[in-house]
């Protein structure tokens, strides 16, 4: 570890999002380039830095700074440079020169102890003198606070966020109740706050620790997809987390309820406990669905006549259920169309589109992610977009407390201007997104919800499609007939067999459904590599990158993490000149296939021409979005990913925790996607995870070919296993309450 002391000569580059800075340091030995995370660093400041020398392939020797301390300037020139650097608002180079000329080495003492004397300098009023003193004091306090926070292992960026939020009260908050951080600062959860509390010496049975632990337990259940927990389950989980007796936790439920942080609701299964936000999301969603569910007067005979005319003109043939679906869409404010692969959902949607266009009605179409929206566009010939783009995301819906805004430009105050909205892949839509969508729709708009209710539920909380069907308050048309063209696909035929719980013949006589029996995990991986690199690209006329490995689990010998590490080395090996970046347990390279693993509404994307001209830009990259790494810049510490529609995003290295390799992904993450070929490694696993719906979802992701490699007994057991993990939701009940 090297220690160097000198003045900040020039700031070459600064990333305002994460504080990453490149600057020239001037000391007795000359100039030195320093790189690292520095918050509020200004030219002219005297700093003592600790770090290690590295050699950059382009920029030469640099000092990578691990920690630093800002010192008071020690000579007149440095004091003048610091004051005139822009660090103090209103003080330029010439005014700084006059201040130092007047007070010389005594400058900082005058500013701190006798600030009124600054008015003796030409160009400084008494008011300005006070403002300069306040700014200098604030910067001094901020630096002390940063050093204090970093003692607790808090990163520079998080420390800056904490100080920006609390200011001089930072010490008081941390020493009084550090659990406030978990509630008020994004990026700090209960566990970090708990570590700080332990270091400070706060007792494990303190009131605010228990209250924060209860709330954290509920938040974790939301991450699992639940909207509530029963009291008994909540208390057991919180007790295990806090290592505190249940009897010492239960009494806090009423306190949290009185503070409106949670909602307690009696039910047949016992007392339900909700995070207040999600309780009211369900309630508001149910009410808005009820308000949209209007009936429109139009005679069936008139609708039927128009449908038959459309069939003739568009050269399509609808069966009875498909005609019923079109009629339900015309006559109702909300209708639900569901069915498995090959049952004619797309044909039915096209018939609806033709019908509404014949009535000169405007239609908007959307799906939860970009891949599903693109498939919708290809299937219908009409533009579809993501729900987030439809609603014009302009903030963070997860932080926006105003229910009329929801972090979107399209909301109750600025609703969508259309007659019909068709949403596909509804099984992927979670409660917050459904609420945001409904907030932007006015009664009188027809809402058509399309999906496969046998797919896995959304990654986020809720089970929207199933709850809407279970409420029995909306017209539902379930398509079951497999059309002749689809019958030629064993992917479709076997998917329906799996859904019905029927055994599937694994004789490998199919043209698009194969099962390769293997028992050894390493042999299975070897087969995967052969399939992806040599066999399948030619068979389905696709690139190896287009072939997707889907696996049930994240961990284990055939889990996402291990498979990605192996697949990366074979599909995108290191090469001289190919940039790469290590981050935690991951290593990213240019050319890697990656996935965003959390919603980030603040990430900016842009679409540019080959000449660098920006033709479109926006905000928001979402959980499950997949792209390719196109650039890694170690100088600016950014990694660029190109997503669908050629949207490019620059990630500061600090945000790489939001990305992971995507050569292999979990089946759950594949929802709404379709790939030319899917390869599924399959050995034994936990019964609660290895169930029928998981297998059904995986198989229906393939367009041309499914290959399963592994244990055929596990495959047949999954078909028989209907023990899908149930989610605690109450939307169906809320809807029925409004429907009467």
Model regions and ranges:
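Pre-Walker A (Motif I) flank of P-loop NTPase domains
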Residues: 331-337
